[in-house]
Structures are given as C-alpha cells and as structure tokens.
Amino acid sequence: MRTGGRPGRVNAVRVIAGLAVVALTATACAGEQVTGELQTVGEVAGLPVTHFESGLKDDAAKPDVRAEGATDAVEDRLALASIADVTDYWDEQMPEHFGEKFEHVDKLMSYDPEGEAQEVCGTSTRDMALNAFYCPPEDLVAWDRGVLLPLLREKFGDMAVAAVLAHEFGHAVQTRLGEKAGIDGGTSTIVKEQQADCFTGSYMRWIAEDKSKYFELSTSDGVNEVLGALFLIRDAPGSHANEQGAHGSGFDRTYAVQLGFEEGAKRCAEIDKTEVDERITEVPFKNATDQAQQGQAPITGGTMVHVQRSLDQAFSATGVDPPQIVEGDGTCQQGRSTPPVSYCEQNNEVHIDLTTLEKIGQPADQVGELTGKNSPDAGLGDFAVFSEVASRYVQGIQKGVGAPTEGGQAGLRTACLVGAWAKFANNPDSGSTLYLSPGDLDEAIAELLQPRSLLAADINGHRVANGFARIEALRNGYLEGSSVCTETYK
C-alpha cells in the first residue's frame, strides 16, 4: 500500500441503519481471549455446506488411462484418475452446452524434472519444474510428478492435483471449441487463463454435486483447498494482465474459479477481452518508488495513523463515532479479545499488537511458497495486516448502526465491508490517506485463507467455515461497494 493523499469525505461506505439487533448471549468474561471457532453459514453457490475428507472415493475404479512416463507413485495415480474424471465431465458437457462431441486429448505425459531429461513441446523437462501444461501442437497434457504434484498434495491435499489438471484440460477444450469460446490466434493469454480457471470451477461443482465416479469434494475444506491451490500459482505483484503468459492475480484467478462453480461451463466460454478488461485487478506498479518497495508499507505506529484516517474517511457517512486504533498487546481489559487485533466494545477501541502484526506484514515469499521453501521471515504483506485491523474496526461501525455483530452473516458482512474499504482506497478521487498497490488484494485473500484470520469473523472472532463464501464476500464489497454488504449479509 502507498501512503499519501488529501483529506476528503466520500460516501463510499453506506451501512443501513435500523437493522434489527439479534440478541445473542456473550460467553466471554473479563479479559477472556476468544478462539476462532468455525461457523457454518448459508450455502456454497446453492449447495449445502458439507464437511468430509475430499479426494479419491474409496470404491473408485482404476482408470483406463495411459500416460508416457507414468509411474505407480500416488501423484501419477491421482493424475490419471483426474484425467479419466475430467474427460467424463467434458464427454457430458460438450454435447450438452456446445453441441459437439469431446475429442479426447491425444497424448499424456508424466515427467520428473530432476530425472532424465526429455524433450516435450520443444523444451527439456529439466526446465519445466513446477509445471503442468497443455501443448496445442501435440494435443498433449503433461505434468511434473517430481516437484509440483507432491508440493500441491502436501499443501492442499489430493484435490489440488485434480484442479491443476482440470485447468490444463480447460485449455484443450478451448482449442476444440475455437470460435464457440471466442478463441483464435489473437486471443490474449489472460482471457484463455480466465476461461480455463472458470472451466476448473465448473468441473469442481460437478464433483461437489456427487456426479464423479472417482472423486468427492466437500463444499467447506475441499473447496477451500482447490481455491488455495490455484491461488498459489498466481502472477507476481506488478505484473500486467496484458503480458504474454499472464495467469492473473490471485484475486482474479479465484474470481474465475468461483464464476465457473456458480454458473457452469457455458458461462465460462463467454469470458472475453471486454469482460476481463472491465474487472481484472492485475496492474503494474504506478511509479518507480512503489516498484522498488514492491508496494509494501512498513507496519509502524505512523502507518497505523494513515490506516485510521483512511477508515475514518471511508465510513464517515455513517455518522458513527469511529473506533480508535490503540497500540498494546492486542487484547481488551474487559470482554472479548481476539489478539493480535481486538475490538474492545467497552471503550470503542481497536487494540493491536504491533510486534505480531509486523511479522505478519513482512513481504510474502512467493517463490518460496511455490518451491515449498518459504523463508522463515516471510509474512503475507502489509495489506494482510491492514485488512485484519479494518475487520475489527468495522465491528464498531456495525455496532454503531445497530447491525448484528455475532454469527456467520456478521462475519461475511465484515469481509464485505473490508472489501468496500479497499474499493474506497483504490479510488484516486476518494481522498484516502492510503492507496492500494498491486498485490494488496492478493494479500487480503491470503489472510482470508489463514486458519487464524479475523477478516471474515464476527465480533467474537468466530470465522465462517467455507473459504468460498469468505472470498466471495470480500470480492462483493470490492466490486460492488458497501450497499451489497448490508443487502446480502443481513
């Protein structure tokens, strides 16, 4: 994030007053620290929230699929099952939505980049670590079983393998659909990637509806893991969406996956340059200073003054007495505490533990994330911290207007209002003392996916169970503004 700007008052955040206050008994005693209990709330794109271990079904048959170089390793077994399954999916979807038969992918290849070098699609496998790809000239899908798939399984579980290969099959589908998906030789990479991510989401919905012979996917942790896996493989902050090879920011990638999960494969094929240009958030750094700092502001008391001012400006139209951000140990002397950031009702203050927040706010080590060798000093970035602080600040705003502050809907409304604040801070005419930098929205999503995150938690620190709903709430606030927060999360 960047500091600066002029004082201003913009009606960017409109909280509807007069909401009925839900009377819930608080169990926290004086000074009690409340842990992040999970809450199941609502649905996931029309499906019930389910809780079970996702992955291969116990009774799944051995797939009748062969791939060059495949071994009996669990990663290859998962890959072959994934390919059999996503092929079944497209055998069904292509005739139904596009009026044609799905021609199966011609070649499949498994390789270990640390093993014997092989040439595939004009490149040595030694140079293709951490990769899975579709090669149009050879109609081939290949995957790195030695580094990438083990890393994905370790971090996100078996469904991450299915998600990554489904994405590559999405590119094969594009090649077959051609003009039916608006794809030709001049189509930009980012449009192709957004479509492929969307196709992945539509396939995951099919599994979640229990239509797969091979896999089962819960709509809580299972969907969370799929989103986390695709979020991991995102472009670096400051990348431009129009660059050749751009895959999109984490914010943009998760949006496309959720779009497919919600609206299906036919909608994915409608994604075009006009749509992508209107909503894509991946932009380069605005100046040399921002690039040199990689968009990171120090987590200091001085920076928190800017956070306070920006939040006050954004929510001034509510007429609510703004909570004050106070340095300390991040706890309240009385009532609920959710360190390292707590909203203290008795004095309308947000207490922060700056030492802990400084560690969280260290720049992310994206290369380390991808290689599984994350630096011990790496954090999530400055906006991960600022969004956490904002999540407790808006407890005071919601309380001030009489909105419920406990329960799952309150947690989602919180994430939505943080997104609305980010929208305010991204508006150069808002007068905000803080402005978004490239990568800030990804830092917020990274924070949302943390097990300790308060970003989609109610006043007690109880967070919503499914990451799909958490990310969707943040995105709704950012794209639509605050009115959608109170209209959607009542």
Model-inferred region functions:
Residues 146-163, 186-190, 360-388, 402-408:
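Short pre-active-site segment immediately N-terminal to the catalytic Zn-binding motif
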Residues 113-142, 327-351, 358-366:
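Catalytic zinc-binding patch centered on the HExxH motif and its immediate surroundings
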Residues 67-68, 72, 79-85, 97-121, ...:
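Acidic helix-start/capping segments at beta-turn-to-alpha-helix junctions
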Residues 169-184, 202, 207-208, 392-406, ...:
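Catalytic Zn2+-binding segment of zinc metalloproteases
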Residues 81, 93-95, 191-193, 197-235, ...:
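Short helix/loop segments within enzyme catalytic domains
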Residues 25-28:
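C-terminal motif of bacterial Sec signal peptides marking the signal peptidase cleavage site
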Residues 30-33:
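Bacterial signal peptide processing site
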Residues 52-57, 234-322, 454-490:
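Pan-zinc metallopeptidase signature
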